[in-house]
Amino acid sequence: MDNHGILESLLFTAGDEGLDEKQLLEILDMSKNQLVELIENYSSHGLMIQRFGTTYVLTTKKEAATYIEQLIEQKSQMKLSQAAMEVLSIIAYNQPLSRSDIELIRSINSDGAVKTLIAKGLVEAKVVNEQRSQQLITTDLFLNVFGISNIEDLPTTEEDDEEMDAFFSNLVNQKGENND
């Protein structure tokens, strides 16, 4: 990997805090002039390196601002009601299952919550094994939102309570003000 790639990786890992010039010079084993030249020659399609005092930060280019604002708006719309969170967890742990299966588990009509989850792209309805009713399953977006690679990565009852609490607090953080 070249120095541009290493610098980009370091700044990406450091996140919003960035890295102090001294740290970069030490890690990259180069002079200040070499670092300045490296940054001046840095080019990425959507990223740039900015200096704030003696700290360097990997940031997005200003031209991407409107697209980033759209993404942030979409993410803010991902908030879920308590009912939708409950239905989502039922589907995640028991998939595939039908709407009637969810109603049996919850003892209440869940159509509103299911429609919300489908509309937000967290759940999809599919015909599984030629069954008469559509079966609900989680999507790749669900995996992405909850930071897991596959459904088997969901916490199980055998795992630490802390891990379960962390997963469900992530769900609670998605809670919106609307009730389904």
Swiss-Prot record:
Key words, A-Z: Cell cycle, Cell division, Chromosome partition, Cytoplasm
Pfam families documented for this protein: SMC_ScpB (PF04079)
GO cellular component: a single term: cytoplasm
Subcellular location(s) per record: Cytoplasm
Gene Ontology biological-process annotations: cell division; chromosome separation; DNA replication
Function of the protein: Participates in chromosomal partition during cell division. May act via the formation of a condensin-like complex containing Smc and ScpA that pull DNA away from mid-cell into both cell halves.
Family per similarity comment: Belongs to the ScpB family.
Assembly notes: Homodimer. Homodimerization may be required to stabilize the binding of ScpA to the Smc head domains. Component of a cohesin-like complex composed of ScpA, ScpB and the Smc homodimer, in which ScpA and ScpB bind to the head domain of Smc. The presence of the three proteins is required for the association of the complex with DNA.
PANTHER family, A to Z: SEGREGATION AND CONDENSATION PROTEIN B
NCBIfam families in UniProt: SMC-Scp complex subunit ScpB
Protein name: Segregation and condensation protein B
Gene giving rise to this polypeptide: scpB
